[in-house]
Amino acid sequence: MPMTLGYWDIRGLAHAIRLFLEYTDTSYEDKKYSMGDAPDYDRSQWLSEKFKLGLDFPNLPYLIDGSHKITQSNAILRYLGRKHNLCGETEEERIRVDVLENQAMDTRLQLAMVCYSPDFERKKPEYLEGLPEKMKLYSEFLGKQPWFAGNKITYVDFLVYDVLDQHRIFEPKCLDAFPNLKDFVARFEGLKKISDYMKSGRFLSKPIFAKMAFWNPK
């Protein structure tokens, strides 16, 4: 029975999950909910189902896999990672995965706070000023390894790819000083399942954020 992934019809917090499902050749329904336009941003399409799905903490994204009903994007990825043994194999690798999962979420939220701010035009230069230091930390953490936990891909690589790619869209030159991060992105996009997905009609790279964001390339 196929899994069901529910989320808005945007990239957002579901991108890494969709990439992981495609990479692992998982059968799933990508259930997308639409949001209305300004000024109301009507969410009735989701709200009409929100409390009828049996979710403990009803929210988007959600994943339903048989009797397992999961919310919180990182919990979903971790669940999928365990199913496919892509969570790190040694304690050192698992520590790296745990640290990076949270670091990537911090970076994602920092960018989102800027992009959703009514004061976007003032906050953008401030954010860009601190961006090289953020990217430097990711570059140093990756080092010469092909993947962030080591020699084998883990679910956290899907998260970090998403975060790096969002920043590459936000500031196209942000990875230029970090060849290993550029190589990582190219390596990830070169994976056959990922490459095939990105060329398919199912692939959704934009919009990144919901309609109320002040920066949201279409």
Swiss-Prot record:
Q: Quick one: where is this thing mainly located? A: cytoplasm
Q: Where is the GST C-terminal domain?
A: 90-214
Q: Where does the GST N-terminal domain start and stop, copy by copy?
A: 2-88
- Catalytic reactions on record: RX + glutathione = an S-substituted glutathione + a halide anion + H(+); 11(S)-hydroxy-14(S),15(S)-epoxy-(5Z,8Z,12E)-eicosatrienoate + glutathione = (11S,15S)-dihydroxy-14(R)-S-glutathionyl-(5Z,8Z,12E)-eicosatrienoate
Which keywords are on file for this protein?
Answer: Cytoplasm, Lipid metabolism, Olfaction, Phosphoprotein, Sensory transduction, Transferase
One GO BP? response to catechin
Gene Ontology MF: a single term:
glutathione peroxidase activity
What Pfam families would the database entry show?
Answer: GST_C, GST_N
PROSITE patterns assigned to the protein according to its UniProt record, in alphabetical order: GST_CTER, GST_NTER
Q: Does the keyword DNA-binding apply?
A: no
What EC designation does it have?
A: 2.5.1.18
What further fact does the record state? Yb subclass selectively binds steroid hormones.
Q: How does it assemble?
A: Homodimer or heterodimer.
Matching PANTHER family: GLUTATHIONE S-TRANSFERASE (PTHR11571), GLUTATHIONE S-TRANSFERASE MU 2 (PTHR11571:SF271)
> Its function?
Conjugation of reduced glutathione to a wide number of exogenous and endogenous hydrophobic electrophiles. Participates in the formation of novel hepoxilin regioisomers.
| Family membership noted in the UniProt record | Belongs to the GST superfamily. Mu family.
Query: Any idea what this protein is called?
Result: Glutathione S-transferase Mu 2
Q: Which organism is it from?
A: Rattus norvegicus
